Swiss-Prot record:
It comes from Synechocystis sp. (strain ATCC 27184 / PCC 6803 / Kazusa). It is found in: Cytoplasm. The modification 2-(S-cysteinyl)pyruvic acid O-phosphothioketal is found at C129. One of its GO terms (cellular component) is cytoplasm. Its main location: cytoplasm. GO terms for molecular function: UDP-N-acetylglucosamine 1-carboxyvinyltransferase activity. This is UDP-N-acetylglucosamine 1-carboxyvinyltransferase.
Length: 438
């Protein structure tokens, strides 16, 4: 008898996080170095031809990618745990391979240092999270104001200093929007420019201040960082430095939400409480108390949860990078809440995944209207971007039953061993390989 073989599905695997919800948390979380600060500072090491030694560097996929990008343009790197020694003495003009740059928006940060130090560069247009267009026009206009010739050809930004001058020229630059990336690009380029550069309507984020502190540690003359006007007086050369990265305020806020949603008392160390001011204020509105036990330590004290309204704004307003995590918390907070996203378009994709878990959320434009429910239900969910992935983990901690979070490449870009840190607090979650049927 002729037997016909039955086709079998090809099995591949994907890495997921499996969460058993409703576990109480307790203990202390060690907060890693700030990803967004580290990426800009790593690019800033190009400004100096001597060694730069960085510490408190987080172990993240984005940091790995930036190391690869720097190495591809001739930078020598030696990494040991959270320490990184960078030697940019032989850096080239670029461009870095597009397959690397396309995965990391922060790769574009190298344009300012390369142009200012070498007089010309080629940098591919960047990639990263799919949360809006986030164009680089403000970066480009700032460099042009300082005397750069910039044009885009075949997806590559070509920048050079006009005429016979080997240095950019200081300029007064007004940013139409207080863009963090544009502020960082112009600030770094201005450190080696001739004369004074003034950035008006500059971004005020702590990561800007950290970058300015790093540049000052190399001999740059910068004042006003942390305000809307930054003034940079260019110098001819920068020198080597040892510099620690600040703690990650977004990671800290994420763990505060994890404590609040599980009604658990947890401590965070090290942190800079001032960097968490808006998150702490909103947590107190929602119900939990945040005690500042030391200059670098905070403690989440659980309380009943109630709804509140949140609108994302540039710093010192409520950060867009904390919006998704707080939405997960508000989904199980009594009463009504409205979360309005004003910084990025297309950054409410996590709503559909929270709805799969039983959240009562309705979208209208850039606003999410939330009616709190008593509990969420575990479900398979898909991460859509970095902070959305953290929000789904937080939701899974509070959900009844099992939650499977897929799309971990987003999570690994911005959180160092989040499951290990949560397990240490008592959460029941593990990273597993799960078959995918094609």
């Amino acid at each position: 008898m002729l037997q016909v073989a039955t086709p079998t599905a090809t099995e591949e695997t994907q890495t997921v996080i499996e969460i058993e919800g409703r576990a109480s948390l307790k203990g202390e979380v060690r907060i890693s170095g700030a990803k967004n600060s580290a990426l800009a500072i790593m690019a800033g090491t190009i400004l100096c031809s001597d060694d730069c030694r960085l510490s408190n560097l987080p172990a993240l996929a984005d940091i790995d990618k930036m190391c690869q990008i720097l190495a591809a343009i001739g930078v020598n790197l030696e990494r040991d745990g959270d320490r990184l020694v960078v030697d940019s003495s032989n850096v080239g003009h670029g461009p870095a391979p597009y397959e690397l740059v396309s995965q990391l928006r922060a790769s574009f940060f190298v344009i300012g240092p390369l142009l200012s130090r070498l007089g010309m560069t080629k940098v591919p247009l960047p990639g990263g999270c799919a949360i809006g267009t986030r164009p680089v026009d403000l970066h480009v206009r700032g460099l042009q104001a300082m005397g750069a010739d910039v044009h885009i050809e075949h997806g590559v930004v070509n920048a050079s200093i006009k005429g016979h001058s080997r240095r950019l020229t200081g300029a007064k630059i007004y940013l139409d929007y207080p863009s963090v990336g544009a502020t960082e690009t112009i600030l770094m380029a201005a450190t080696l420019a001739e004369g004074e550069t003034v950035i008006d309507n500059a971004a005020r984020e702590p990561e800007i201040v950290d970058l300015a502190n790093f540049c000052r540690s190399m001999g740059a003359q910068i004042r006003g960082d942390g305000s809307s006007r930054i003034i940079i007086n260019g110098v001819e050369k920068l020198h080597s430095t040892d510099f620690p990265i600040i703690p990650d305020r977004i990671e800290a806020a994420t763990f505060l939400c994890a404590g609040a949603i599980t009604h658990s008392e947890i401590s965070l160390f090290p942190v800079v409480p001032d960097h968490l001011a808006s998150a702490i204020a909103k947590l107190r509105e929602i119900g939990p108390e945040v005690a500042i036990d030391a200059p670098d330590r905070v403690r989440l004290i659980p309380r009943d949860l109630r709804g509140t309204d949140i609108e994302t704004l540039p710093y010192p307003g409520f950060p867009t990078d904390m919006q998704a995590q707080f939405m997960a918390l508000l989904a199980v907070s009594e009463g009504n809440s409205v979360v309005t996203e004003t910084v990025f378009e297309n950054r409410l994709q996590h709503v559909a995944e929270l709805q799969r878990m039983g959240a009562n959320i309705k979208l209208k434009g850039n606003a999410a209207f939330i009616q709190g429910v008593p509990f969420l239900s575990g479900a398979p969910v898909m991460s859509t971007d970095l902070r959305a992935s953290a929000a789904l983990v937080i939701a899974g901690l509070a959900a009844e039953g099992k939650t499977i979070v897929q799309g971990l490449r987003h999570l690994d870009r911005g959180y160092e061993d989040i499951e290990g840190k949560l397990r240490k607090l008592g959460a029941k979650l593990t990273r597993i390989e799960q078959p995918v049927t094609l």
